Amino acid sequence: NGSREALFALAQTVIDASTAGATVVCPNPFYQIYEGAALLAGAGTAFANSDARRNFAADWSQIDEATWARTQLLYVCSPGNPTGAVMPLAEWRALFELSERHGFVIASDECYSEIYFGAEPPLGALQAARALGRERFERPVAFSSLSKRSNVPGMRSGFVAGDAAILKSFLLYRTYHGSAMSPVVQAASIAAWGDEAHVQA
């Protein structure tokens, strides 16, 4: 179904609430499902506020090292919602290095990946990982949806890609809570995902 379900389910999959101080880091402003998913998974939240000097991009430097050490999940959104700020490769590198040091999962909300102002499309988490030689994709998980790409928010069609071990656990969790898509929605989704012309129009 749509990426909102997946963004929520990932937190339930990867958060270990028995760990003292389990934390989810989010950009601010943020899509409300990030905080809801964190709280229902039993984690606390920390927020990286937007920096007006950088087109309102999240300022990850506001998160101190002690908080990063407790972090189990980081939500990022590039292009940002509602700011439109895009994360450059250097910012991805810094977050990957933090993830490697502290072991947290990066949930990359890429629903707006095809709505941008510049000439070049923004880097997604997996593209950035590959560009940095991190082709095993350890800890990043990317989310996308047809609702923005194809202007079909009622269709509830999205996908998840990334770290294979995390996705194995994610799919097991989804077995118990997810709902199947109807054949009609599946067929329409395949057609929409397979067509670029309507996205560029």
Features from the language model and the residues they span:
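A short helix->loop->beta-strand "cap" motif at the edges of active sites that frequently abuts
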Residues: 22, 43, 101-105, 136-138
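Active-site phosphate-binding strand-loop segment of PLP-dependent enzymes
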Residues: 50-121
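Short hydrophobic alpha-helical segments of the AMP-binding
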Residues: 14, 24, 34-38
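Aromatic/hydrophobic pocket-lining residues that form π-stacking "cages" and hydrophobic walls in ligand
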Residues: 34, 95, 125
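Short beta->alpha connector loops at strand-helix junctions that form conserved
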Residues: 28, 47-51
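Phosphate-binding glycine-rich loop
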Residues: 1-23
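Conserved coil-to-alpha-helix start sites within the AMP-binding
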Residues: 3-7, 30-35
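PLP-dependent aminotransferase class I/II
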Residues: 139-201
